Curated annotation (Swiss-Prot):
It comes from Leptolyngbya boryana (Plectonema boryanum). PANTHER family: POLYPHOSPHATE:AMP PHOSPHOTRANSFERASE (PTHR34383:SF3), POLYPHOSPHATE:AMP PHOSPHOTRANSFERASE-RELATED (PTHR34383). InterPro entries: P-loop_NTPase, PPK2-related. This is Uncharacterized protein in chlN 3'region. Pfam families: PPK2.
Length: 136
């Protein structure tokens, strides 16, 4: 079933790219030790209790299987048109910086600009401006 899913994901992402969508995929890679620290903070700090689910602790028992599954996903769905960016996430400041840098670089590479306005449209805008400014 997974091979079929991987192909579907790749085809969907290729479709998006062919239709002008930029696909950026980030995996925020938190170490097992850091995850434990964050879970304990969520339990110990009442204002963070809402972030913790008992199932989080149970699922940690399957850490190695999750890591293998993630690796399988990355190997099968990272493509030239929709790559995965695996970002170390133990230090939030670094994670935010790395993700922001990739987004900014991608946006710059698109060479985006505002649409140009034709002379006819510019005249219409000036006329609309006169109408608005003449209101009482």
């Amino acid at each position: 079933i997974w091979d079929k899913r991987f192909k579907q994901i790749n085809h969907f992402e290729q479709y998006l790219v062919e239709n002008g969508i930029v696909v950026l995929k980030f995996f925020l890679n938190v170490s097992k030790e850091q995850q434990k620290k964050r879970f304990l903070a969520r339990i110990n700090e009442p204002e963070k209790n809402w972030k913790f689910s008992v199932s989080d602790a149970k699922e940690r028992q399957h850490w190695d299987q999750y890591m293998e599954a993630f690796e399988d996903v990355f190997n099968n769905t990272s493509t030239s048109y929709a790559p995965w960016y695996i970002i170390p996430a133990d230090h939030k400041w670094f994670t935010r910086l790395a993700v922001s840098d990739i987004i900014v670089s991608t946006l710059k590479s698109l060479h985006l600009s505002y649409p140009t306005v034709s002379e006819v449209r510019r005249a219409e805008l000036l006329e609309a401006k006169k109408v608005l400014e003449s209101e009482e």
